């Protein structure tokens, strides 16, 4: 049985583990789907945040959402890439963490999501917390206590 003292995690917050916004690919409201698809493909991410010009978080967009938006009744309508905007296909109802949220809350949320967007108290995008960052910290703590 693995046992790690609870206090090991009480002073760890989302802001301590997240990747800052400057290092995260994103698109803005008003961008076309073609631009969003290019950013997704070039970055290698499966989904990216959608921000307004002031960096407020509005949702996520993924390659699957873009492809779904291009589906017609009988074919993929590639011309929709030029016609449609990010906000027409993005997902607005997404899980979000605050900078001061606890490690425990972050751990619970990353069970179902590969990453969670982190925002400040006003809803402005600050970065992402990845499942990888959570697992790295857990692995480190387990190794420390199993010596």
Indicate residue ranges for each PLM-predicted region:
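Tandem CBS (Cystathionine beta-synthase) repeat/Bateman regulatory domains
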Residues: 1-147
